[in-house]
């Protein structure tokens, strides 16, 4: 029997550190205003959102710190800036809600993942509150206990 072809993942980049550094209160999907060379690079998977965050200027949201590396075959007449700020495409209600929570509650907005939705590049942003060191340690303990518990359950099932 022939193997089934693997379905390519829609995920382009993940920010795993964000869930370790912050409590994620809310997640919102936003579009990105991209240039042509950036879309080509995203298709090749050359993106990093590890240090990216969202700021607000003139009533609009912008993604800072996201790196999209240009391809080697990119056009020479266009100057490609890998770390340029990119406008987020959100509706006014979402913008007002995020802006209010960031200014009033002292929260921040971080990029969680970058992915394809149909032919459009989307970024999942999270409304986040910073964790203290003891919170991070608590999360690590909980994760380790969960893994140990799963291992015990697996071995208990084999014993009979």
Swiss-Prot record:
Q: InterPro entries, from UniProt?
A: SmpB (IPR023620), SsrA-bd_prot (IPR000037), SsrA-bd_prot_CS (IPR020081)
Location(s) in or outside the cell: Cytoplasm
The yes or no answer to whether the keyword RNA-binding is present is yes
| GO molecular function list | RNA binding
An example GO biological process term is: trans-translation
Q: Which CDD domains match?
A: SmpB
Q: What is its main location?
A: cytoplasm
Q: Which UniProt keywords apply?
A: Cytoplasm, RNA-binding
> Does Iron show up as a keyword for this record?
no
Alphabetical GO CC annotations of the entry are: cytosol
Xref: Pfam families: SmpB
Show the NCBIfam families listed in the entry.
PRK05422.1, smpB
Q: What does the protein in this record do?
A: Required for rescue of stalled ribosomes mediated by trans-translation. Binds to transfer-messenger RNA (tmRNA), required for stable association of tmRNA with ribosomes. tmRNA and SmpB together mimic tRNA shape, replacing the anticodon stem-loop with SmpB. tmRNA is encoded by the ssrA gene; the 2 termini fold to resemble tRNA(Ala) and it encodes a 'tag peptide', a short internal open reading frame. During trans-translation Ala-aminoacylated tmRNA acts like a tRNA, entering the A-site of stalled ribosomes, displacing the stalled mRNA.
Q: Which family does it belong to?
A: Belongs to the SmpB family.
- Indicate what this protein is called per its UniProt record: SsrA-binding protein
Give the source species.
Haemophilus ducreyi (strain 35000HP / ATCC 700724)
Q: What is the lineage of its organism?
A: Bacteria, Pseudomonadati, Pseudomonadota, Gammaproteobacteria, Pasteurellales
């Amino acid at each position: 029997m022939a193997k089934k072809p693997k379905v390519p993942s829609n995920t382009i980049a993940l920010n795993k550190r964000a869930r370790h550094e912050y409590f994620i209160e809310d997640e919102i999907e936003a579009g990105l205003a991209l240039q042509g060379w950036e879309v080509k690079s995203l298709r090749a998977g050359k993106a990093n959102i590890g240090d990216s965050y969202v700021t607000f200027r003139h009533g609009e949201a912008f993604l800072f710190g996201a790196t999209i590396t240009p391809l080697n075959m990119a056009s020479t007449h266009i100057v490609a800036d890998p770390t340029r700020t990119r406008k987020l495409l959100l509706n006014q209600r979402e913008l007002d809600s995020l802006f209010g929570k960031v200014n009033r509650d002292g929260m921040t907005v971080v990029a969680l993942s970058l992915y394809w939705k149909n032919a459009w590049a989307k970024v999942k942003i999270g409304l986040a509150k910073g964790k203290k060191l003891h919170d991070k340690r608590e999360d690590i303990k909980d994760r380790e206990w969960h893994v140990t518990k799963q291992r015990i359950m697996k071995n208990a099932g084999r014993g009979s």
